[in-house]
Amino acid sequence: MRWPVPPVGYLLLGGQGLLLTFSLISSQNQTSPVTYPDLNLSAAPEPRDPLGPLVLCSYLPEEFVECDDPVDHMGNGTAQQELRYGCKKFGGQAYGDVEHTQVMCRALDGIECDGPRSFLRGNKPCIKYTGHYFITTLLYSFFLGCFGVDRFCLGHTGTAVGKLLTLGGLGIWWFVDLILLITGGLMPSDNSNWCTIY
């Protein structure tokens, strides 16, 4: 009676499994840290315990941190240079018109991490949303533009009163505002962007 011989592939796979098991056991028993002389760690702060399980707080994924909104310096370039982050202006029609800045983030409570819990992160766009929807404003402009409702909605109160008193500039101002709104020339007065509808 002869025993069946397993295929060579199974023997090789079993040998690799044993080799992996022994290497894992031997690496867990190692007590002295391994030094790597060719690594440059000057760019990142050195953690307290390099063999520990904690990750630097600044390396945490987005779901484990909460970030503030970008700081509004209201056009003050000196304040932006002193703080080294924040926005001089908000909004823009094209990607190139929008400033980008870092924001202050904090690790959430209950998340264990190494290093300072507050840090600067990201390249966030200087955009704010204040509840202005393009389609709503376009409908206001089309149906009630002669009464200045579109300008009131966007916060341009002075020109809205003038448009109301002249009944949309006898239709000319109504038509011009409709074209300006469609082409992006008429935006909210607080420099916010249009809210998107998903």
Swiss-Prot record:
This is TM2 domain-containing protein 2. The keyword NAD does not apply. It is a multi-pass membrane protein. The keyword Transmembrane helix applies. It is found in: Membrane. Pfam families: TM2 (PF05154). Residues 28-128, 188-198 are extracellular. Glycans are attached at N29, N40, N76. One of its GO terms (cellular component) is membrane. PANTHER family: BETA-AMYLOID BINDING PROTEIN-RELATED (PTHR21016), TM2 DOMAIN-CONTAINING PROTEIN 2 (PTHR21016:SF4). InterPro entries: TM2, TM2D1-3-like. Residues 150-166 are cytoplasmic. Residues 1-27 form the signal peptide. The chain crosses the membrane at residues 129-149, 167-187. Residues 131-179 form the TM2 domain. Belongs to the TM2 family. It comes from the Eukaryota. Keywords: Glycoprotein, Membrane, Signal, Transmembrane, Transmembrane helix. Its main location: membrane.
